[in-house]
C-alpha cells in the first residue's frame, strides 16, 4: 500500500487512477492511499467519498502531521461515515528542533536538540481520544515511543478502534545507530532508546501493535551525503523487513513465525478490509516462499536506492519466490 506523499500528491481522483494503473504494470498488487487534506495543507478535506470510489485503500497525509484538532475531528467523522481508515504521522513539529534524531543522549553528544518523544506522544494521545469520540478506525503509523505504545494500549482498552504499526528499524535499532551510520539512520520519527525498543517489542507481543510496516523511503546517495541536520529523513525497508522480523522477533522467541506473518500480512489486510493476506482454499494465490534459515548479505537491492543502515549486513531469512495471482513474479 503506497502512501499519498508522491509528486504530485494523491489528493485527487486523476492522480490516484494514474498510480493504480501504473501499479498494474508491475506484476504485483499495488494499492494506494489518498490524502486526507488537499495539498497536504491540513485545511480542507479531500473528496474522500469520491477517492474511495476511485480505489483508494485508505487516507493519510503521511510525512506531514495534521495539527488542527477540529480538522482532524471532521476528517475522522467523515472516515467513520464512509467506514474507511485514516493513518496518522504523529509528530508535533512545535516540539522538534532537528528532525530525524531522538532528543536524548546521542543528540547531546552531537550538540543538537533533536526530536523528543513528546512530539509523538502528544498527538497519539489526541488522536486516540478523537477516535474514541467519533468511532473512526485509525492507524498510528511507525510508532517509535514506548509511551505512545502505552497510550494505544489504553485507547484499545477504552474501546477505540485504534491500530498501530511499527517498522523493522524501530524494533531493531536505537538512537546509537546514528553515531555509527549517520544519515542512514535518520528517519521520522527517529530511532529512540533501548527502553523504547523493548516497549515496542512488548507491544507486538501483546497485540497492542497490530502491524509491521516498512515506511519505505528511498533517497539518493547525494541526498544522504549531506550533513546530518540537512539530509532528508527516511530509509528503504522493503527488502530487509522479513529478515529483521525473523532475526529480532522470531529467533529470540518474541513472536512465532505465524504471528510474524499475521503482523506483516493478515493484519494489514484486515486494517484495509482487503480480501488477501491469508492462505486457504479459495483465497487469492498471492504467496511468498522463503527460507527462514538462509543467510544473505544486504549489499544489492532491487530498489534504485540503498539508503539503509543495514547495508552490507548479514541477514537471516531469504525470499525464494514471490507469487501473485498464481504467477511467479520473482525467483531467487
Language-model features: locations:
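Histidine/acidic residue-rich metal-binding segments in metalloenzymes
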Residues: 21, 43-212
